[in-house]
Amino acid sequence: MKFILYVLASLVLFGLSVLLSLYSSANVYSATVMISQSPVHITIGLNVCLCLFFAIANALKTLLFGSLQTFELELLYEQFWITLTEIMLAITVFREAISISFFMLLSTLMFARVFHSICSFRTERLQIQLTDQRFHIFSRLTCAYFVLSILDASLIYLCFTSEHLGDKSTRMLFVCEFSVLLLNLTIEASKLCIYLYEARHLDQVWDEKSTYLFRLEVCRDGLRLLAYSLLFMYQFPYVSVPIYSIRQMYTCFYSLFRRIREHARFRQATRDMNAMYPTATEEQLTNSDRTCTICREEMFHPDHPPENTDEMEPLPRGLDMTPKRLPCGHILHFHCLRNWLERQQTCPICRRSVIGNQSSPTGIPASPNVRATQIATQVPNPQNTPTTTAVPGITNSSNQGDPQASTFNGVPNANSSGFAAHTQDLSSVIPRRIALRDGWTMLPIPGTRRIPTYSQSTSTTNPSATPTTGDPSNSTYGGPQTFPNSGNNPNFNRGIAGIVPPGWRLVSSNTQSLSTNSAMTSLYQNASSADNNLGSSLPNVVPLSRGLTQSNETSNTFPAASSNISSQLRELHTKIDELRETVSNFRADYNSIRTSLNQLEAASGINERIQTTSADSLLNSNGMSGTEGFENTQTSITTNDNQSSILTSSDQTSPFATDEDRQNSRNVQLETVDENF
């Protein structure tokens, strides 16, 4: 309504200016001369021409497209700034050729771009379902393609033949632009034909549609790049720096490169989808949401179809609705996943890449498999060699083809340690020289050195040899290595470092230890035959019920490390005996002082209160595995009217215990020792 009022006001103002010129002039010729020479009359005339141009364009838009929707207006507004930048560059380059004809061609080019953009929006948005409601839209869109193609061809011919529109360089600019618009219109019409063909064959799925669409887009970008390259070569003799052509060439080249790269990633992600994305089991579907995130339909395993199949609509031919599991653990339909991968090669839920073993993006919560990956990355693969053995810890041996199909304690896709596991995440980090039996896995021991390196020059007869840090090639990463007491037997290294590396422990899903488990003891037969003393050096094995809590257990150490620990324990026991003797002396002195105070108070009859507080306990009886400790003891001596009383309070146990209370084993653990005491 506002635009109509603006057009009417412009026409009325232009009519008044013409009447005023005729009234003040003797004849029509003099009135025409006055209008052409007066700046006010020229401005009013240009305003009327612009209003008429906008009115014609608006009428053509209403005729071809009808009313625009909100999202179309937003997209046009976004493209307006790009078009405005290109116009400014064109005016800067061709500032000498600026004229009324130049502005008319430039305005026509702007509106032609708007119409072509609307056609592109409608084509991409159009769902080719030829019902009675959509047939009118489809016919109007076809008419718009026909009218715009005639308009583009006419303007190209006009710019080629009409010399009064400007010099050759300016006309070639508009020829190139209208040719690119005609090319875009042809590509969009071809895509519309592809959509129409797909709509005519709804009873089957056309998987090759994405390939044809990609070829059309590549042809579009390639021909655009060729057109602007020819324009650059033609304008170079006339324009010193053809900035406009350079920008268009860069845009086309980047679009072509990005499209080819995305298609290559799509081909990589969909090369063998049945092998890359295993079929989700019925148990995994039960433990997760059965609704597909893309189509919002319920997913079913092929072996467990829905019960009410008669009420459901028949699926088109070739439509694969098999639930596929991504590396991140999310499940989607096969067909929905393929359509999604055409646009993005990431999970639609967590945005994790589906190509390769890539980590989660920053700021996005990790999937359950990431926890298992973080644990497994602490174990190096000694030789980084592929293996065909089962993944350690998979509890369901019948699903070796799909390592993710097992569960443990209600956790989907979990190994025996309770963490979710994935073959691609664990195969390159966990040492897999030997296969672990079902119900066993390896967990790291926090706070321990893993995979220590022993020097080549270490004597095999020296039991106190200490581990040294050397070249990784001389460690259990795969290089040669000499261990204490190994002799010349080659099975020693394989028995220790080849099965369970130092700093790790075996964890079982039952309460049976390694020494009584015949299934796991067979793994160490070769190692046990290498050395008679090897049985005492077997890795630390704990049940699963204690595996996650015993983080401070002693790790699998070599004889040299065991010797150092024994010497440290002997020194610790010596210090404990010295502390006990000091405590005994302190107790005797304390008793003598207390007796003297009682005698002094009874003799002198002085009313005073003496309050003494003993020192804090030196050792905590709970932390010393049977060794008593001092508790907070407070003694109050109160004397009132020649009467004294001694109040002694203790938390649990008096520090002055008898010898029987102090009897305990040598298995102690020192947590805190005050050396200044």
From Swiss-Prot:
InterPro entries: HRD1_E3_ubiq-ligases (IPR050731), Znf_RING (IPR001841), Znf_RING/FYVE/PHD (IPR013083), Znf_RING_H2 (IPR024766). It is a multi-pass membrane protein. The keyword Metal-binding applies. The chain crosses the membrane at residues 3-23, 40-60, 87-107, 141-161, 172-192, 226-246. A zinc finger (RING-type) spans 292-351. Residues 24-39, 108-140, 193-225 are lumenal. It is found in: Endoplasmic reticulum membrane. It comes from the Eukaryota. PROSITE patterns: ZF_RING_2. Its EC number is 2.3.2.27. GO terms for cellular component: cell cortex; endomembrane system; Hrd1p ubiquitin ligase complex. Keywords: Endoplasmic reticulum, Membrane, Metal-binding, Phosphoprotein, Transferase, Transmembrane, Transmembrane helix, Ubl conjugation pathway, Zinc, Zinc-finger. Gene3D superfamilies: Zinc/RING finger domain, C3HC4 (zinc finger). Belongs to the HRD1 family. This is ERAD-associated E3 ubiquitin-protein ligase hrd1. The lineage of its organism: Eukaryota, Fungi, Dikarya, Ascomycota, Taphrinomycotina. The gene is hrd1.
